[in-house]
Every structure is written in C-alpha cells, then in structure tokens.
Amino acid sequence: MLGTADLDLLWVCTPPAAHAEPAIAWLDRGLPLYLEKPIARSLDDASAIVAAAAGSRAVCAVGYQWRALDILGDARRALAGQTVGCLVGQSVGGTQARSWFLDNAAGGGNLLERGSHQIDLARALAGEVTAVQAAAASVRLAPRTGPAGDIDDAVTLVLHFEAGGLGTIVVAWTSAALPGSYWVEVTAPDAAIRLDLDPHFRLSGVSNGAPVAAVAQARPFDRSVDRFVAAARSGAPDLVCCAPGDAIATLAVAAAAEEALASGQTVPVSCLG
C-alpha cells in the first residue's frame, strides 16, 4: 500500500515490534512521518529508523506527547542553573488490554507503554541517564478477560542521572475501576516542583524562594500533533517535539531497564545500543 497510495503523511500506530518496516519505507519516500512511541521495540530497529530519518528529507516525529506540554518550559526554567538531586515519577492506572500490550516481545508491556513516557520526561527535566536498576512485582493488579500475557503489572525503576542525581519511576497497570495517578516531582538545591499529568496538566512548587504555578493551555497530545503538522507543512523538522534521535535515547534507557529486570543488576545505559 505504501508504494502506491497517494498520501500526504503517515501515522504509524502498529505494535512497536512492527514499526521499522513501514517507518523506513515511508521515510525513504521522503514524506512526513508521525511514529507512535516507543520508536521501536528493539535498539537495532530504532537505529535503522534513525538512520533512515537522517538520510531523508522528511519530517519525522515520535509520539512522546509529554514533551509537547506547554508548561514543560516553565518547569525547566524553575530548575535552570541547578542540578536535579531527586526525581520521582508515577504512572499508575488502567489501560486498554490490547493483545500486543500483553505480549512483551511485541509491545514491551508497562515498561515501554507507560514507563518510557516517564523516562522521556525524566530526561527532559533532569538530563541523561547513565545506569538503571529495576524490580517488578509478582502481584497481578489488572484483571484479564482473555490470555494473561507475560508482562509485569507493576515495575519500579531507579535512574542514575549523568549529573549525579537519582530518579525513581513507578509504573503500574491497574483495574479500570481504580483512579489513575500520573505525576512527577523534582527536587533541586533551590527548587521543588510537581507536574501533575493526565488529566490536569499543571505545574506547582517553589523555585529560588518564589512560587511556581502554571496550567497547560492545550492537551499535549493535540499540541504534539499540531507541531508535527506545522513542521510537515513548513519543512522545519525542529518544530517537532520529539525527534527520532531523542526517542532512541529514551529507548536505550528502557532497554537497560529490561536488562536490569532480567539480571537483577545495575545496568549501564551506554552498554546497550
């Protein structure tokens, strides 16, 4: 279909393990591509997509929508000139149990579906991650109406930031009857801020003795798409909120977390990819 269809742009929403083939084919045509996160299931596939994007004239965006928060700039300014010492993020709530979501090989489960959003936001606020520790609960939190799948319902990550700080990310898939909880808190020497995420999207806290407060004026998903469309129309790739080169860095942290889950060890991010 991609070879013959008269399309203006492509939005790849396949399971992550099936991202590479359509993404690379479309980039080779030189036409705009919006690629749902994560960029791919494996670092090899992600590297191939990044290479295709680098060699293409096409605009390419990856759907880490929290990057598109209009109050993310306010949060960064509150932390400007400071080193983040502690970051804590939580993404807990129900989600649609698509068959590939329950298949770790196809989708990566909670770690990629939810955790990579938090990893990406942590990188945006606290800088690059050099090593990861991880643990998963054996408790089933979300009911299954079909196959149980092979994913972990609850995962906790410890991120070691290049600048010296630590981050903790808690991710869990729960019953849809329970309230969701999505937020991140960041502490630096002269700042303590909180970003409430879905569904409120607001910033609060203190920076250098002054209160910090802001409310998002647009939903980040809508803003991410709007920025992509503007980039595609103008041919200005810098307008996209998350480019492939940034998305693969988030995937590298998630891949290290997967290795940490399997080994029980602290895994350097640099040893993967």
Where are these regions (language model features)?
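Beta-loop-alpha module in the N-terminal Rossmann-like domain of NAD(P)-dependent dehydrogenases
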Residues: 1-50
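C-terminal helix-rich "cap/oligomerization" subdomain common to oxidoreductases
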Residues: 9-12, 58, 231-273
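A general structural signal for well-ordered alpha-helical segments in protein cores
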Residues: 19, 23, 46, 72, ...
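A short helix->loop->beta-strand "cap" motif at the edges of active sites that frequently abuts
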Residues: 29-31, 56-58, 165-166
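Predominantly a Rossmann-like dinucleotide-binding segment in NAD(P)-dependent oxidoreductases
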Residues: 66-148, 264
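Contiguous beta-strand/loop segments that form the cofactor/metal-binding neighborhood of enzyme cores
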Residues: 120-200, 225-236, 273
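Active-site loop of classical SDR/Rossmann-like NAD(P)-dependent oxidoreductases
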Residues: 195, 215-226, 242
